[in-house]
Amino acid sequence: MSSRTRIANEAWETLFRAQATIARELTAADVWGELAPHEYGVLYALAGAPEGVRISELQGDVLLSQPGMSRLIARLESRGLIERADDPDDKRACRVRLTDAGASAQRQVGTRHGYHVAQTMTRTLSREQLVQLRDLCRGLTTTPRGSMEAGAA
């Protein structure tokens, strides 16, 4: 195994373990109120899209299967936190968007969650390290697949 391959795999494993450790801590935090963390994830994704989002677009943000996402949307809709709306771009599709109650729940939980994220991340990282981590992770999420597969760096 080449040095580049070894360090890439070590970096991936460390990143994966760090994300899993932090995710467990954040999920266990007493900040969610009446929402499950994945329900909050949907509300958070919708908070940035007042015109609504297609359900298929939400799947990338929440990382659920299509049937799981459909059940989650139905639960949130039955609780009055989201509503369906016509998609002006495709009459066969619909969008989901926050209701006033959903926006309120998102803001309340989001404030507590954001504070807890900050506490968790700043416990061991300086501001400069957080900026560097953010920038590195942005690079990982914006790298075209083709260049990664071709081995370009």
Model-derived segments and their meaning:
Residues R24-S65, G151-A153:
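N-terminal helix-turn-helix DNA-binding core of bacterial DNA-binding proteins
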Residues E10, T14, T21, G41-A45, ...:
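Pre-recognition alpha-helix immediately N-terminal to the DNA-recognition helix
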Residues M1-G33, R79, G139, A153:
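N-terminal leader segment of winged-helix/HTH proteins
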Residues A18, I22-L26, V62, A105-T124, ...:
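Alpha-helical linker/hinge and terminal dimerization helices associated
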Residues M1-R6, R127-A153:
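C-terminal regulatory/oligomerization modules of transcriptional regulators
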Residues R4-I7, L35, L98, T124-L125:
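Alpha-helical hairpin
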Residues A74-Q132:
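Charged, amphipathic alpha-helical coiled-coil/dimerization segments
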Residues I55-S56, P67, A74, C94:
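Residues within helix-turn-helix
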